[in-house]
Amino acid sequence: MLNPIVRKFQYGQHTVTLETGMMARQATAAVMVSMDDTAVFVTVVGQKKAKPGQDFFPLTVNYQERTYAAGRIPGSFFRREGRPSEGETLIARLIDRPIRPLFPEGFVNEVQVIATVVSVNPQVNPDIVAMIGASAALSLSGIPFNGPIGAARVGYINDQYVLNPTQDELKESKLDLVVAGTEAAVLMVESEAQLLSEDQMLGAVVFGHEQQQVVIQNINELVKEAGKPRWDWQPEPVNEALNARVAALAEARLSDAYRITDKQERYAQVDVIKSETIATLLAEDETLDENELGEILHAIEKNVVRSRVLAGEPRIDGREKDMIRGLDVRTGVLPRTHGSALFTRGETQALVTATLGTARDAQVLDELMGERTDTFLFHYNFPPYSVGETGMVGSPKRREIGHGRLAKRGVLAVMPDMDKFPYTVRVVSEITESNGSSSMASVCGASLALMDAGVPIKAAVAGIAMGLVKEGDNYVVLSDILGDEDHLGDMDFKVAGSRDGISALQMDIKIEGITKEIMQVALNQAKGARLHILGVMEQAINAPRGDISEFAPRIHTIKINPDKIKDVIGKGGSVIRALTEETGTTIEIEDDGTVKIAATDGEKAKHAIRRIEEITAEIEVGRVYTGKVTRIVDFGAFVAIGGGKEGLVHISQIADKRVEKVTDYLQMGQEVPVKVLEVDRQGRIRLSIKEATEQSQPAAAPEAPAAEQGE
């Protein structure tokens, strides 16, 4: 029989329910987690045996949103969910990052976590629910996992931290921060903020970590009740003799190699040392495992770099702990793009462009929480040549999507509001060289490219990656880490922001015991680095250009009477289509009567504005207009008087004598002066040529207010 084991608890303003034992009983563990009607079903399957020769930990996290959760049918051609969206990929990474460091060293059995969103309350984001579910399922499974973890979202509204704010509350919040950690320590932070201070950000991390303890306690209680026996897994015994033999052959040589400051040269030398060491040892004993020797050598490398940093010696490339690599900043490097920049920091380089488009270029995202439009796009590309390798080139991988989102978060806080700058903006960062922190180089490059494009960003932003090496109570925080320092260190800590505050913070911690004090030191050191980079960037460009690129569309905005919108659009869109073809512009009309005309040529925009003003102009009774004969009928003639408006000149109003035949007086296409006699309730216009000729001078079409140019 199905015997569900259920645990309920209050978590901030929400009620969380954990349920296991009901579904997916052939999986290693399965949990249904719900938080106020948002429910995520999370399963874990772990293989009891590792694949022979497996030398890394094969953990896969899949996060999938089902549209039935929101009571909808997919809008795709096949009416079925397809490959993961960008949002799903980012949440899969969010789940993966805090759980990965909690598996023991040497554990290489395959583990797969699948989180499926099966019900959604539009006010409760499923990401936190999925993270709690993954933590609970892994803890129940018996797989060696040093959890559980808790997860919390923290907002900052009216100078107060808010635990797990609703979607509506998030719109008012100056902060959107997700923090995950164990009972003892924070493991991961992912956030965007509206330029908050270091203390405010650190306070949010600490607040979120304290509040999530209730989740950890309840998962532990559930494990006592429903957990599976812990696997009897033991790491391979350490071969001390072999370790000593490898160290004797390679340690001194590797130590020397890590004094080579050039990355390519250093890599080449390290490869030579490793292959010579392995060849020597295999010649002595053919039964040795090459993979095992590689792992021992990697551990020696790690130890060499870490012990040198902790001893206060210069880093791999000769820098002190808080030194930034040499910077080279250039703007306007590509002639036809709307804005461009080349940002180089040591051996990391990003070519960044900014492109301006109209509102119809905005991305419409059909998400589970509802449809939304994004007018700021940020795409990050990491080609294999950037690290001197060959490889596949194609659609973006998880890492590229994640780095693009982080860089976007870094810039978002300074982007202008749509009503001040009515453009869709796309930033693309091409990483042309990489040795550490390419996502933060993308933030710096984006800030420069946006200024070069004339986008009125509120402030320049820069980003920096920090690292940490910690042994016991001894620790060193490193500024502007290299790729090697990232792999061999204990923390990766990326901070982006302006002179006034932080716009994005991302932290991944690989060890336990990172205290509030260490995070404080890292944040303060990052601020110094950020201000240094901003100083160099400001020498290249210190404010957005006064004008947008001549190749970018200029958006002119005019207001019309909302009642006249139907006249500008016409039947089935006929008038607006004809207008765009005639004037060579893009025209967008909003419900409140705001009309946006986009054109690369100012004359075309003026022509479009003039035509719209003609169409929407009010017809004045008693006024004389110059019109054109469009139709001749037995009882008179129809005359167009501009703006798509047409009136009837009755046969009795053509001349001041009796008219037998209209065509004796009027021809098709003939221009004639006409006086407006009447506009009836249906908007029908009565005209007179007879009375117009009595008045000497015809009037032009009525004037409308001049357009303002949105630049």
From Swiss-Prot:
Phenotypic consequence of gene deletion: Decreased growth.
Disulfide linkage: none
Ranges for region Disordered: 689-711
Any Gene Ontology biological process: RNA catabolic process
Residue ranges constituting the KH domain according to the UniProt record: 553-612
Domain S1 motif: 622-690
Effect of residue 100 to D: Abolishes enzyme activity
Subcellular location: Cytoplasm
Protein name: Polyribonucleotide nucleotidyltransferase
GN (gene name): pnp
